[in-house]
Amino acid sequence: MKEPAHFVRRGLFNVLNGNISYDGSNVPVYNAVPNNATYPYIIIYSVSTNQIEDNISNYIADVSTRIEVVTRFADGDGGQLQANQIINSISQLVILKSGLMNLNSDGFNVYSQVNEGITYLTEDAPDHTYYRGIISLSVKLEQI
């Protein structure tokens, strides 16, 4: 079986990049956050790949991927709302019943993209407060 995690990340990147905005500005999407990143931003990373069914003809896997929104405010400024609204925009593009990612050219047929939960975290640093929204996404696919 081919390892599909990087194909899933690239597919999600292609779906989100240039398609998520906040207050009229594009929200950048990364798989590795550069030192000069501006806030808010989105990062996509793989968690695991598990073979979920073994039959005589196809490899079927569940790829667990996280899509994380990171926002930052000076202490006492801002809140979770920005992360909530960006997560809402992302959810409408990736948590679908039809129109799933097309990874056919990579040798995979995606048949399910399921929200496994959305987590919100707050981190207080000395000079800023960071709000993070994290979508845990299960992508089920078969190698074709």
Range-by-range predicted roles:
Residues M1-V27, V47-I144:
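Charged, amphipathic alpha-helical segments and their flanking helix caps
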Residues V29-T38:
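Short acidic low-complexity segments
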Residues T38-S48:
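A short, hydrophobic beta-strand-centered structural micro-motif
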